[in-house]
Amino acid sequence: MFEIIPILAFEDNYIWLLHQHGHALVVDPGDAHPVLEILDARGLQLRAILVTHHHQDHTGGVEELIQATSAQVFAPAKEQFSFPHHPVTAGDRLDIPGIALSLSVLDVPGHTVGHVAYYGDGMLFSGDTLFGAGCGRLFEGTPGQMYSSLQQLAQLPVNTRVYCGHEYTERNLAFALSLEPHHEALLSRREATAALRAQGLPSLPSSMALELATNPFLRCHEPGIIAASKSAATDPVSVFAAIREMRNHF
């Protein structure tokens, strides 16, 4: 078995560190220093760095980690990076040296045009595509692209554990409840999330089952979300675009 450690960076970023038998990988290291501290404290050898997209808060620590370790870097083929890396795209499989784990690469454009996610062994590292009770802003992609990406992730097994790039769950739940104030699953999740955060614990990982039940961006076909969106068109992409715009100003 392996252990997954959430490393908080900046205000609300998560760098995910997975290790087994002294070998480790990290996902989206925006800052090298907290990663190096844990590697040193636990006597771990960093073998791989996985990048989901090009934003600085997810890549800022990569070059320093390359210099400090022998780690290989895997990053989206459709995006540009200044550091050496192995470009990855949909369908690629990554076998991490020293760790009994094989990950599949999923293309999930929307937040950025080349964004990828990594899935394997019941785990999804979703970057800034899927959040707890939310999804990423559309900085580069279209509503149709992001909706399609989210629907792709929604097809994963319901027991998939979801490791997101940011601690946004409480704010996302507040927005979701502004759409559906009396939704029992949302109210229950808000209570559970508040209890975790009050203890200084992450609200993550989530699960795909929980997201399917409470994430409005995965429920754009449901009558309650359609009504709350006030969208003139009721197809799921139009509803998604409407509530994503509402979330931008929430």
From Swiss-Prot:
Metabolic or biological pathway, per its Swiss-Prot or TrEMBL entry: Secondary metabolite metabolism; methylglyoxal degradation; (R)-lactate from methylglyoxal: step 2/2
UniProt-recorded Gene Ontology molecular function terms: hydroxyacylglutathione hydrolase activity; metal ion binding
Chain positions recorded as Zn(2+) 2 binding sites: 57-58, 128, 166
Pfam families: HAGH_C, Lactamase_B
Enzyme class: hydrolase
Catalyzed reactions per annotation: an S-(2-hydroxyacyl)glutathione + H2O = a 2-hydroxy carboxylate + glutathione + H(+)
Record protein name field: Hydroxyacylglutathione hydrolase
Species for this entry: Methylobacillus flagellatus (strain ATCC 51484 / DSM 6875 / VKM B-1610 / KT)
